[in-house]
Amino acid sequence: MTSFLTAARTEQESISYDMQRLRLFSGTSNPALAREIAAYLGVPDGPRICKRFADGELYVQIQESIRGCDVFLIQPTCAPVNDNLMELLIMVDACQRASARQITAVVPYYGYARADRKTAGRESITAKLTANLLVKSGVNRVLAMDLHSAQIQGYFDIPCDHIYGSPVLVDYLAAQELNEVVVVSPDVGGVARARAFAKQMRDAPLAIIDKRRSGHNVAESLTVIGDVAGKTAILIDDMIDTGGTICSGARLLRQQGAKRVIACASHAVFSPPACERLSEEGLFEQVLVTNSIPIAAERHFPQLQVLSVANMLGEAIWRIHEESSVSSMFRG
């Protein structure tokens, strides 16, 4: 499997392509990630104006010609989710009206993903609604990372490339030469994700926390299925929101004799009081997340390690532009 911790594409790997036809533009939700992606590809983060009027309306202008170009718009729809989603839709519309040949929405974090099905009467399936909005706005393709559930990929009536942040997390953990590792799913719904992660961790054993949720953002851990005593437990999830699920799981693992606990997640949503919970002394040895969502400096804590997925996203963008395989990035 390709390592995505290298600085940039090497000269030997950089197959010649039409630089004038590949254009990157970032919204305002994560410009730092966009700059890293641009550096990996060796192309500029294109000039644009994104601003807000006094009444709260958003304005976007692309400040160079993109007629006939292959345009990639980098915008995770994290908090403030409604503003960032609307900004992305306006960017797409601006590019479409500027005669871009193809528009790809690069959405490292896909907001509203947890509303992927009806769990009660008269609810909206907002993950599908968001997909519809992107398609209707004029997007030709979506590049997303670690969607909350795999079926969301099928909500799009256009191509959707779904990539995973796990290789970046696995590369980091492999460099630490951990012994006696067990990969733990914080709930039954995450078993497939944890099993895939365990396979990448040299077929590490798997454990599951059986949990019942009593309300939104409230979770109760009941029992551990599997042996964690004396081992390094790696708790893996797609996102950490308030931290309730993963922290209650970590406490249970400690009670069951885990030597140390490491939390891994692609998306650091970190809604309050997540940072206070995650930084609790003696709970986690490390909390590993990616930079799919920007994390303000005041929300950092000693156990936190933020790993960049810029190279991986940049590689996927390059392959889409070159019409080569994206899925092969994650084979072998």
UniProtKB/Swiss-Prot annotation:
Keyword Ribosomal protein in annotation: no
Record-level GO cellular component terms: cytoplasm; ribose phosphate diphosphokinase complex
Xref: InterPro entries: PRib_PP_synth_CS (IPR000842), Pribosyltran_N (IPR029099), PRibTrfase_dom (IPR000836), PRTase-like (IPR029057), Rib-P_diPkinase (IPR005946), Rib-P_diPkinase_bac (IPR037515)
This protein's UniProt keywords: ATP-binding, Cytoplasm, Kinase, Magnesium, Metal-binding, Nucleotide biosynthesis, Nucleotide-binding, Transferase
UniProt-recorded Gene Ontology molecular function terms: ATP binding; kinase activity; magnesium ion binding; ribose phosphate diphosphokinase activity
UniProt cross-references to Gene3D superfamilies, sorted A to Z: 3.40.50.2020
Catalytic activity: D-ribose 5-phosphate + ATP = 5-phospho-alpha-D-ribose 1-diphosphate + AMP + H(+)
Domain of life assignment: Bacteria
Full protein name: Ribose-phosphate pyrophosphokinase
Gene (name only): prs
